[in-house]
A protein has these predicted regions:
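Glycine-rich oxoanion-binding loops at beta->alpha junctions
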Residues: 1-14
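Extended, hydrophobic alpha-helical segments in both membrane/secreted and soluble proteins
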Residues: 3, 19-22, 26-40, 50-52, ...
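A generic alpha-helix structural signal
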Residues: 7, 33, 103-106
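Glycine-rich, anion-gripping cofactor-binding loops and their flanking helix/strand elements
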Residues: 8, 23, 193-196
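Local beta-strand N-terminus motif with an aromatic residue
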Residues: 14-15, 162
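Generic beta-sheet signal
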Residues: 15-17, 142
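Short acidic, glycine/Ser/Thr-rich loop/turn "cap" segments at secondary-structure junctions
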Residues: 17-21, 71-72
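Active-site phosphate/pyrophosphate-binding segments
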Residues: 39-198
Length: 198
């Protein structure tokens, strides 16, 4: 249903698909590829209307993507919210020069982390607090609320970043068996009426 709604106003010959999938094995992604190919039909040259962004180029080739239409990124990079990787291509196309400004901001944050000892200590303290609360105080959840409208999707980003990346199986010999917390939250002025009640 969602796919049908999205393509309804589109013209097949003028539509370009960017398939972003780290593994090229997620059911929803593969179904979307098939639906897109079916919708495009004979009116479109597949190579001119589809590219793939993935860490698994051989799997993309199985679905008909040619080498020239596959943008590869390292397997170590997360598949979602990977702003610093080719996964961000749709955002680059949409935002243009604004995305360059965003990258400059990211570079400034990296530079601050590398050069500012107080900032490093702050981040270490914050990280160790999470480990302490989770492993020793048994606080397995954390709420993140943002009160800036521009930051309203930050919780979504943090959920994906932390629960996918930090939630991987820990070293079986580590004293820290719980690597991350369950992250909840949203836009503060609306979400506070639910999370703050508990």
């Amino acid at each position: 249903i969602e796919f049908s709604e999205m393509i309804e106003p589109l013209i097949q010959e003028e539509t370009f698909f960017i398939v972003s999938s780290k593994s090229f094995s997620t059911d929803e992604t593969l179904q979307s590829i098939e639906l897109s190919k079916e919708w495009s039909g004979m009116k479109c040259d597949f190579d001119k209307h589809f590219i793939a962004i993935t860490s698994q180029p051989k799997k993309a080739q199985i679905f008909g993507f040619s080498d020239k239409n596959i943008i590869q990124f390292p397997n170590e990079i997360g598949g979602r919210y990977s702003m610093w990787s080719p996964i961000s291509l749709p955002a680059i196309l949409e935002l243009g020069e604004q995305f360059i400004e965003f990258l400059i901001g990211g570079s400034l944050a990296d530079t601050q982390f590398l050069n500012d000892r107080k900032y490093q200590e702050f981040l270490k303290t914050l990280s160790f607090s999470d480990i302490w609360y989770n492993n020793f105080l048994q606080k397995g959840t954390r709420v993140l609320l943002t009160y800036s409208w521009k930051m309203r999707f930050f919780t979504d980003y943090a959920q994906q970043l932390e629960m996918e990346s930090i939630g991987k199986q820990p070293n079986k010999d580590s004293i820290f068996q719980k690597t991350g917390q369950v992250v909840f939250g949203g836009f503060g002025s609306t979400a506070q009426h639910s999370y703050f009640q508990l």
